[in-house]
């Protein structure tokens, strides 16, 4: 299990970092600089609003399907037609509910028009997620990794031509950015569908009432978790746009810091997506997933912590590098969001363990509590602190959810890290931040200071044994280990 995970996650990280880094820094950032804060802020708020009700598109079906197929790949043929029928019905519900709320909130005609395209994109993105859950469940992990970045590759090509191809005579429009996403999602959805039909042996679509009932009942716990996490992940920008004066501009300023946070958060998401089918297959065969979880935690949390603390030390300099004119409050919110990356990483390790072990009732209670806390804190802190209040809320919510997930895993399954290990990790992050604080005051350039801080962070991670590259290399090259792993899998 560990060798399979290590090889696949290294491939996924390499591909994703190359593609998504160019997307965030080359395309997304350029679009915001070109169209301006108000236009991008309106898009960002509407995009976040379109995400809020995506629970209705999935209702936990992708998570349930991934776990079910990973345990028994032949279930692809059994579930495919039934899930497809459910998704079509859920799509209608998603459009009705989202548009009803949009009209109730007083969205204007041009906002609704833009929202409709964004909603179509969410439908296709959700469909891709479900199709990929079949592919990863069947253990085609490298293929799933390629599909995970295929949409961004297509968006880069389309937006690159529009931005730098000399065909946008009157300037780039935010609507083109949205339509490029539509083209990308449609292409990847068709490719993913063809793969699932062929590799899964799906000959025809034949819904079955009993199977439908089983899917709905078992998918509801996933739905509660997905809904709660979606709300406390995306509600902030919607509330910023609604609660603050010049809300669209404020949402655009918040997006400046949130963009990098969202991009870095994809790393824990990738870890969770890769871990779930492997852990599920391991548990179904009676294997111990603790060694895999410990290795994944070391691989994720050490570099994530080092990078996040370094970025949080130089927030103004990083935003100045990325944007023509960082907005008011963007620096403070960016610093807080970078610190938030660490508990996000913890959540995706521990929540994946709970999901693989079918501890969804506990996970649902944790995430729903986090959602309620997040909404209340946002309503209080955004009017008081502005966009920094939303970032502060994110830090508090994610930290408490992370702690709750750790406690739940320790009490119901097994412990990954003891109190001493946790204390060492916090001490390592504190020392890295202290090193950066000192380096800022030496008078050297901020890039040199950041590079030295990163070096100090890597040295501390090695010293505290939070990363062990030689051990990982031996695991990859040890063929005997590979054979033993395959025998267990």
Description of each model-found segment:
Residues 1-24, 77, 81, 209-225, ...:
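N-terminal membrane topogenesis motif
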Residues 22, 57, 81-108, 157, ...:
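Alpha-helical transmembrane segments of multi-pass membrane transport and lipid-handling proteins
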Residues 1-6, 170-178, 190-233, 274, ...:
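Interhelical loop/hinge segments that connect adjacent transmembrane helices in multipass membrane
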Residues 112, 116-119, 145-198, 369-374, ...:
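Hydrophobic alpha-helical transmembrane segments
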Residues 24, 29, 57-74, 137, ...:
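Helix-loop junctions and terminal segments of transmembrane helices
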Residues 22-39, 166, 227-263, 278-281, ...:
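Helix-terminus/linker motif at the lipid-water interface of multi-pass membrane proteins
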Residues 4-62, 95, 99, 121-122, ...:
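Signature of the first transmembrane helix
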Residues 436-489:
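Membrane-proximal transmembrane or re-entrant/amphipathic helices at the cytosolic face
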